[in-house]
Amino acid sequence: MRYYLLMKQDDKIRIYLFFGISGSGKSNVLFKFLRQKILKERRHDNGKMTEPPYEVLSFNSFNICAGEMCRKICRMMSVPCKAGISKTPKDYSYRADKTYFVDTSRKIGDQKFVYDFFSKSVFAAKCFLAVPAIIDLQILSGILEQYSFLKDFQVVLTFCDFTNDKKINQISEFFESRKIRIAARNNSGTIDSSLEVL
């Protein structure tokens, strides 16, 4: 297997991976986190960013519109986007001076393929599982079972403005009892946290 990596020795390529069942809001979360990163970068750089240190990789080939939507949002944010690499990720040129945001397919098998690929030692990957806060508690165990291939991940609760604090607290307790960290809460307008720096 070949990797085309433009990197210094001992550097790892930073990757943020977003997983979740169909309709969980994972792509929405990805772009909100990316926007936070861009705004933070511009604040520290006096509003200038010659080349964005970020890139979006879309593995979402299940829906024909998903890649196009991803490209359009990236154009609006002035961030490079590569869609359609789901079959040949090993042939892509990854750079250690960039951080990659990975949008995954809705199919669990495809998500596992992406996770396995970016679990290799040349990558420093951080995984986030988008979980709708409106979901029934009895279904959460099944979702965790589906994503048992994720060895180290954090949860982002989505659709928080479509439920109440009691339900959110119940879901939070569910994850806390399993020692799974909730990284952020997402609603229609904002996300209440930012990704930890790799």
Regions found by a protein language model. Give the residues of each.
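Extreme N-terminal, non-catalytic leader segments
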Residues: 1-13
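Inter-motif core of Ras-like GTPase G domains
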Residues: 112-135
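Switch II (G3) loop of P-loop NTPases
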Residues: 58-61, 65, 76-86, 98-114
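Hydrophobic positions on the alpha1 helix immediately C-terminal to the Walker A/P-loop
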Residues: 29, 33, 69
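The conserved Walker
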Residues: 22
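Canonical P-loop GTPase G-domain recognition
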Residues: 161-198
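Short beta-strand-centered segment that lines the nucleotide-binding/catalytic pocket of NTP-utilizing
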Residues: 19, 41-66, 85
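Conserved glycine(s) of the Walker
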Residues: 25
